[in-house]
C-alpha cells in the first residue's frame, strides 16, 4: 500500500469515528448520488463547470425551462395584465391576496431561473463550438455575446470580416482579434446536425433573454402599483426582489431594518475558492443603484440608511397610503441630502498664528570666568572660515570618500579684498576741523621730513631732487628762520612798542 492510500484510509476511519457519514458507509444513500441532502442544510448542487455537455445530443434535454408549463403560464398572465391596466383604488385588503401581486413575485423568481438556464445553454454551446473555433471562448467571455457570435459565424469563419451584424455585438478591437485568430485556428468543420443543434440552442438562449427583459419591464411598471413608495427609493427591480424574499409586503413591513438589509445575502462559498470577494452582511439593498453610486467606504453606511427608509416606505405601502408616492419622494430626498452631506469636503482649517514661545529664565551670568569659558568653547577663526561658503561658487570636496565635506574659505586663495570689521559711523570718534588743520600743519615740512621735526624713523632723508641741480641737500630749518625773522617784528616776545620809543627819542 502506498503512502497516499494509507492517508486516504486514515481519513476514512476518522470520518466514520466523527459521524461524518450517517446512515451507512460512504456513498450510500436512499436516492441518487447527486440528490443526497444533509440534515438541516442545503441540497448539494453540482457545479455548472463540472458538467460536460459535449456528448449531449440536444439542448432541450438539459434546458427544460423554455418549454415548461409554469414558464408559459407566467408569460401569458403577464401579457394579460399588460393589456389591462388597473387603478390603485382597485386594491383593497392585504396586498398578498391580490393575484397580480402573486404574479409579480412569481415572475421575479422566474428571472433567477432564466439566468441559470442561460448559463447551462452557454456551456452547451461552448462545448459544441469548441470543435470549430476553440479560441473564441477566451476572446469573447460574455455569455450572450458568445452565443450571438456563434449564431452569426456558424461554420464560415470568414464572416467576421466586414460584418455589420457582428459590429453591433462586439467592439472593433475584439472583431479584429477574432478575425486574426480565426485565420490560424486548428478547428474542424461542424456537421449539419451539429450546426442545427447549435442554432437551436442559440435561438433558445436569445428567446429566454428576451423573456427576461419583458419580465423586468412588467415588474418595473407594476411595482408602482403594488408598492409605489418602496419602488421610488430603491427601484422597481430591487423592490420586487426584497418583497419576494421576505414573503410579501406585509411580512416586509413587519421586518426590522437590520434584517431587511440582509435580504439576498450570499452565504455559500465554493470549495477551493477564495471568500475575500464575498462581502458579508450585504444583500439586495447594498447592490442597488442608489448605494452603488457612492464611494466604497460609504456604501455600508448608506445601505443601513436606505434599509431604514425602506422599512418606513413598506409600512406605508402595506396600508395603501400615499398611493401617489409622496412619502417615497420625501424619504428619497432625505437620503440624497445625507449622501451629499457625507461627501462634502471638510471645512478649511483656519490659519492661526503660532503662540508666543514660553521662554524659561535665561542665564545672565557674567564676569571674567564666564568670558573665558565662552572663548574656550566658541568657534575659532579657522572654524569660522571653514564654515563660510562663497556665494555662486562650486565647492571642492576635501576628501574623496566624504562627498559634500569642504573646507569653505579656509583653503582658498584670497580675492585681494581684506575682510574688515564694519565701522559704525554713528559711534565713530570725530575730530574738529581746527584740530585737523593743526595736525596737518605739524605734518607739513619743506623739502621733506627730518628726524628733528618728525617722529618718524631715522631713515628719513632731507635730500631733495630738483630739476636744476639734481640732488640737493636742503636745510629744512632755513626756510623757517626766514619766516621767524619776518614775524619777529610784530609777534616776537622781545619786540618793543615803537610809538613809545619814538616819543622818548623826541623828548631827548
UniProtKB/Swiss-Prot annotation:
Region annotation Disordered: where it falls in the sequence: 1-45, 345-368, 442-461
Signal peptide per UniProt: none
One GO CC term on file: Cajal body
Predominant place of localization: nucleus
GO terms under biological process: mRNA splicing, via spliceosome; regulation of alternative mRNA splicing, via spliceosome; retina development in camera-type eye; spliceosomal tri-snRNP complex assembly
Gene3D superfamilies noted in UniProt: 1.10.287.4070, Nop domain
Name under which the protein is recorded: U4/U6 small nuclear ribonucleoprotein Prp31
Alphabetized PROSITE patterns for the sequence: NOP (PS51358)
Pfam families associated with the record: Nop, Prp31_C
Motif stretch (Nuclear localization signal (NLS)): 362-375
